[in-house]
């Protein structure tokens, strides 16, 4: 009888271990904040009045939290200041019931944080944005992963996965560095184990990465957790930095904690589908209604992406610890935070503060597609008097993007053409430091800039000049350098095509000079020359700026330090511009000659 009882208990331990989820999946000693909250999810009920015991004196059990879903447990722990790396053993279960066993790893923090990795991204960097699924396929064996909900890789279908991965990007580090790139930003790499979703009239795969199903798994079609760590390490060895794309606002409806939520308020639920207003003004409008704020912050982005309630303390801690774990585990240098303006304000500051505490050099950029410079500045450190103040380093600077596109394409007007650039930059007074903003000409949600330029290479060059000489951190969208084009017609997939040459058997290989047309290669070379100059230019990477009021389509500004002055001139008209040297004398006085940095 005793033997039978022992075997029954042993079987229980094995079954529970197989069905048990524990997050964070491991943790680190040496954190400034020694608190840790474990989320435990079992396939069977854990029960009430749960006891939780640690095998190590290095870990103190502070509190055991049960929630409405009996399959969950949230355990507050505190690590000793002297805690060492080790394997912990926890036992837990309801009093008088069979106890469950959990082994857990404490690891040492990386000694290279802030020097070799987690270095931050700054104005001297040049960011390259790509969708990893669409850049290059370096390992065709991971295109199909048995057990995933959707298992196709069909390049003929622009809405399906195509097979790009980390290895494909690694294989082209030389290409990127020859272009002058210092930093790689990929759209999200976290697992999107989803069925094809019906979106905007099409069945779409999660190829873009924004539909998370398990935060602690990197998508195996990209290379998985081990492949991502290898990718980040290889990038750092080459002197490249990595930005990861975070999404705190929502997850896929097929995320495991949406299918079995811990609490009733884990998701921002509505009686029927309610999308956000997309009007960020309600967050700083002194006259805004509480209803409009709620719709903006709690509305679902689309109907298959449940909106996360970051006011739930357990969910907030889960997301914060995941951000810390990811940074330490993979050594990323910065975060670009998607859908920033739709997230709970206090939560965003809390997660940013936690990251800055553990990784003082890290960079955080909020992505908020906004309607004004004031809206832009609201989501970063600013000089405005508002009831709430954000703490992110900078923002993805849509207003400067729109201004550069207007300067590239539109005739000079009081507030249009190059005057839009002038007036937009004149409003930098609202930012604490606009040098931390990420500036760009297009991205994965916009028409490609070469198409917007009317496929005019001279217009494109003019816009590239601004991109690489204005204040801020410049970002290039993959393929711009080889004149990839398209409008978002009928949808975003049209501006997310495969990079030519990234797949075996491609008819052309634009990673190679021989595969590029003379025009394409001239643009690649143009960007490379300007980017390489910029990288070594104190004026462009840390200098002040002085701009002059545009006249007759002629816009002039200077970037300067005590040791260097760079003059940038743009004529957007169809006639020669007037060289008004007397007006520019306060920046040109004392100089007798200059050189063209491109020729």
Q: Where on the chain are the PLM-derived regions?
A:
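Bacterial Sec-dependent N-terminal signal peptides
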Residues: 1-24
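Beta-strand/beta-sandwich contexts
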Residues: 19-47, 108-111
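Low-complexity, Pro/Ser/Thr- and charge-rich linker/hinge segments at domain boundaries
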Residues: 28, 106-129, 134, 138
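Immunoglobulin-like IPT/TIG beta-sandwich domains and homologous Ig-like subdomains
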Residues: 32-87, 92-95
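Short, well-ordered beta-strand segments enriched in hydrophobic/aromatic residues
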Residues: 77, 564-571
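Edge beta-strands of extracellular beta-sandwich domains
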Residues: 98-107
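Substrate-binding/active-site clefts of carbohydrate-active enzymes
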Residues: 135-329, 348-358, 368, 374-376, ...
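Active-site-proximal helices and loops of the catalytic beta/alpha 8
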Residues: 250, 322-324, 328, 333, ...
């Amino acid at each position: 009888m005793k033997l039978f009882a022992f075997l029954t208990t042993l079987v229980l331990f094995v079954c529970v271990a197989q069905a048990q989820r524990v997050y964070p999946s491991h943790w680190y000693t040496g954190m400034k904040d020694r608190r840790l909250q474990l989320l435990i999810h079992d396939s069977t009920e854990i029960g009430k009045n749960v006891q939780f015991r640690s095998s190590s004196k290095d870990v103190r059990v502070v509190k055991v939290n049960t929630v409405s879903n009996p399959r969950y447990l949230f355990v507050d722990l505190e690590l000793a200041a002297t805690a060492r790396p080790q394997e912990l053993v926890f036992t837990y279960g309801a009093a008088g019931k069979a106890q469950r066993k959990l082994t857990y790893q404490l690891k040492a923090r990386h000694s290279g944080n802030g020097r070799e990795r987690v270095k931050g991204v700054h104005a001297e960097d040049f960011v390259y944005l790509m969708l990893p699924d669409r850049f290059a396929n370096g390992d065709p064996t991971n295109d199909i992963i048995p057990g995933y909900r959707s298992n196709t890789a069909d390049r003929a279908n622009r809405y399906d996965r195509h097979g790009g991965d980390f290895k494909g990007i690694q294989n082209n580090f030389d290409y990127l560095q020859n272009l002058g790139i210092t930093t790689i930003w990929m759209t999200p790499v976290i697992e999107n184990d989803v069925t094809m979703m019906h979106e905007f009239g099409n069945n779409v795969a999660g190829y873009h990465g924004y539909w998370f199903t398990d935060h602690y798994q990197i998508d195996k079609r990209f290379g998985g957790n081990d492949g991502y760590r290898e990718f980040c390490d290889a990038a750092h060895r080459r002197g490249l930095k990595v930005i990861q794309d975070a999404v705190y606002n929502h997850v896929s409806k097929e995320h495991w904690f949406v299918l079995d939520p811990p609490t009733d308020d884990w998701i921002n639920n509505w009686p029927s589908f309610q999308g956000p207003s997309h009007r960020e003004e309600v967050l700083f409008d002194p006259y805004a209604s509480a209803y409009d704020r709620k719709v903006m912050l709690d509305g679902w982005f689309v109907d298959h992406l449940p909106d996360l309630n970051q006011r739930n303390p357990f969910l907030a801690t889960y997301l914060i610890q995941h951000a810390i774990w990811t940074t330490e585990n993979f050594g990323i240098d910065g975060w670009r935070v998607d859908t920033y303006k739709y997230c709970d304000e206090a939560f965003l500051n809390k997660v940013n503060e936690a990251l800055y505490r553990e990784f003082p050099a890290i960079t955080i950029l909020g992505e908020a597609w906004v309607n004004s410079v004031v809206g832009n500045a609201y989501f970063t450190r600013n000089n405005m008097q508002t009831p709430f103040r954000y703490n992110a380093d900078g923002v993805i600077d849509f207003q400067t993007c729109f201004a550069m596109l207007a300067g590239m394409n539109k005739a000079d007007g009081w507030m249009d053409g190059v005057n839009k650039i002038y007036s937009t930059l004149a409003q930098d007074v609202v930012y604490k430091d606009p040098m931390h903003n990420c500036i760009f000409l297009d991205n994965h949600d916009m028409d490609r800039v070469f198409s917007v330029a009317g496929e005019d290479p001279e217009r494109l060059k003019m816009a590239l000049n601004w991109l690489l000489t204005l204040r801020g951190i410049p970002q290039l969208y993959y393929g711009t350098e080889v004149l990839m084009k398209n409008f978002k017609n009928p949808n975003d997939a049209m501006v997310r095509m495969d990079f030519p040459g990234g797949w075996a058997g491609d008819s052309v290989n634009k990673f190679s000079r021989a595969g590029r047309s003379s025009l394409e290669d001239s643009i690649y070379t143009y960007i490379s020359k300007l980017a390489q100059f910029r990288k070594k230019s104190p004026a462009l990477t840390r200098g002040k700026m002085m701009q002059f009021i545009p006249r007759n389509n002629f816009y002039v500004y200077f970037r300067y330090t005590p040791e260097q002055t760079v003059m940038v001139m743009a004529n957007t008209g169809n006639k020669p511009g007037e060289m008004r040297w007397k007006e520019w004398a306060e920046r040109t006085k004392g100089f007798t000659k200059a050189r063209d940095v491109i020729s």
